[in-house]
Curated annotation (Swiss-Prot):
Protein name (record): Eukaryotic translation initiation factor 2 subunit 2
Cross-linked residues, Glycyl lysine isopeptide (Lys-Gly) (interchain with G-Cter in SUMO2): 102
Localization: Cytoplasm, Cytosol
Compositional bias of kind Basic and acidic residues: 40-51, 96-105
Sequence segments annotated as region (Disordered): 1-119, 139-164
Organism: Pongo abelii
Complexes and interactors: Eukaryotic translation initiation factor 2 eIF2 is a heterotrimeric complex composed of an alpha (EIF2S1), a beta (EIF2S2) and a gamma (EIF2S3) chain. eIF2 is member of the 43S pre-initiation complex (43S PIC). eIF2 forms a complex with at least CELF1/CUGBP1, CALR, CALR3, EIF2S1, EIF2S2, HSP90B1 and HSPA5. Interacts with BZW2/5MP1. Interacts with EIF5.
Keywords: Acetylation, Cytoplasm, Initiation factor, Isopeptide bond, Metal-binding, Phosphoprotein, Protein biosynthesis, Ubl conjugation, Zinc, Zinc-finger
Family: Belongs to the eIF-2-beta/eIF-5 family.
Compositional bias per record (Basic residues), positions renumbered to this chain: 13-22
InterPro entries attached to this UniProt entry: IF2/IF5, Transl_init_fac_IF2/IF5_dom, Transl_init_fac_IF2/IF5_N, Transl_init_fac_IF2/IF5_Zn-bd
Length: 333
């Protein structure tokens, strides 16, 4: 019974725990227990060994669990520390890089602007010193030239040594460009409308066409158009009948009666061709012209540019228009 009392004695277990707590760190419980325990353990040798073995196993398991927990904690702490060290390392590098950049910029900033300012100031000073007087002279000359041009525009007077063309007073031949300039200058002098750039349009009343019966058409305002064009009715009548390929006459109401059915557009086209050939000038396109007949030929004389050119004679009778038909067929194909 003394052995059982020793096994279940709570004081002994407490003492054993207190004795073995400092040995947990050294992990040498077996050797130290044999040295530290006195003669009390020698009295009960067989039975307490089993209890000690059980307690030692329990303590070993506890130590292993504690060591595993410590290892896990150390592992996590190492990981956390590594992460922290990495972050700190990155921040330090960034700060060092920023400091380096700041140092470089501080070193470079005072040098470059000073050089640039020195260069710019030097150039400006040189320009001001060297170009002061020529600039003023050029400005004065430009102002005087502008004033002279304004006076020329107002007065219309130009001063020049040339009294005639460029080749006058010399033995050289004139050039093609000089002749062209002379021609255009004369045209501008004679026709001031061309200088302004306004193209004069010829306005004419539209022809009034009325059907008479089933086989005839009446050109009502024939005489009015002849007066607008300043042409004789006989000449315009001959051209109309030749172009339309019909016969007709003027009745008592001064209306042109034509055989056949014709529309207003057809007569307008004929009148356009007549105006282009026998009314407008071929050089300046002015309608102020006079049609004259000389030795079986008609001549068109312009009153604005005073040019004179021949006009085609009116051909009467049947004429084959094979050329026009061939052109139309070629275009269609």
């Amino acid at each position: 019974m003394s052995g059982d009392e020793m096994i279940f004695d709570p004081t002994m277990s407490k003492k054993k725990k207190k004795k073995k707590k400092p040995f947990m760190l050294d992990e040498e419980g077996d050797t130290q227990t044999e040295e530290t325990q006195p003669s009390e353990t020698k009295e009960v040798e067989p039975e307490p060994t089993e209890d000690k073995d059980l307690e030692a196993d329990e303590e070993d398991t506890r130590k292993k669990d504690a060591s595993d927990d410590l290892d896990d904690l150390n592992f996590f702490n190492q990981k956390k520390k590594k992460k922290k060290t990495k972050k700190i390392f990155d921040i330090d590098e960034a700060e060092e890089g920023v400091k380096d950049l700041k140092i470089e910029s501080d070193v470079q900033e005072p040098t470059e602007p000073e050089d640039d300012l020195d260069i710019m100031l030097g150039n400006k000073k040189k320009k001001k010193k060297n170009v002061k007087f020529p600039d003023e002279d050029e400005i004065l000359e430009k102002d005087e030239a502008l004033e002279d041009e304004d006076n020329k525009k107002d007065d219309g007077i130009s001063f020049s040594n040339q009294t005639g063309p460029a080749w006058a007073g010399s033995e050289r031949d004139y050039t093609y460009e000089e002749l062209l300039n002379r021609v255009f200058n004369i045209m501008r002098e004679k026709n001031p409308d061309m200088v302004a750039g306004e193209k004069r349009k010829f306005v004419m009343k539209p022809p009034q066409v009325v059907r008479v019966g089933t086989k005839k058409t009446s050109f009502v305002n024939f005489t009015d158009i002849c007066k607008l064009l300043h042409r004789q009715p006989k000449h315009l009548l001959a051209f109309l009948l030749a172009e339309l390929g019909t016969s007709g006459s003027i009745d008592g109401n001064n209306q042109l009666v034509i055989k056949g059915r014709f529309q207003q557009k057809q007569i307008e086209n004929v009148l356009r061709r007549y105006i282009k050939e026998y009314v407008t000038c071929h050089t300046c396109r002015s309608p102020d012209t006079i049609l004259q007949k000389d030795t079986r030929l008609y001549f068109l004389q312009c009153e604005t540019c005073h040019s004179r050119c021949s006009a085609a004679s009116i051909k009467t009778g049947f004429q084959a228009v094979t050329g026009k038909r061939a052109q139309l067929r070629a275009k269609a194909n």
